[in-house]
Amino acid sequence: IDLVFEDNDGIIEIWDIKTSTRGWNEYQKKDKTKTAQLVLYKKFFSEQYGWPIDKIQVRYFIVKRKLWEEAMFAQKRVQEFVPAHGSITMRNVSTSFDDFIAKSFNDDGSYNTEGEFPAIAGKNSKNCKWCPFKKSELCNRKERIKS
């Protein structure tokens, strides 16, 4: 969490400041892993401080590092993005996070090395793009789950 504001109506707004080369495109805005971060901030802020969850808003404040040099129009150095963070999204993100914790760690807090962790390639194998195991025998290309 980078910034937390409270307005005169008792609404809390949580901002997360990100830097990006030229801002976020539509694919980055749809990236559930990226947007889940602020949804979890909202959940944990509500739990920790006892603030009603419906009185918490979230927003990404994206600072562009580069602008198009030969643009024929004015450019903004800052982009704001409000991800979905309603009750359905909150429930889905919380369930996914709890499932991750349950599968990744044992009851004593140690890492679960015995679990099964299927390779989910995702749409157009997007999840594999930067994966260090994509060319490894540990992740057989034929066994990856497409979605």
For each of these PLM feature ranges, what is it?
Residues 1-39, 46:
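Non-catalytic protein-protein interaction segments used by genome-maintenance enzymes to assemble
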Residues 31, 43-147:
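Metal-dependent nuclease catalytic regions and adjoining charged, substrate-binding loops involved
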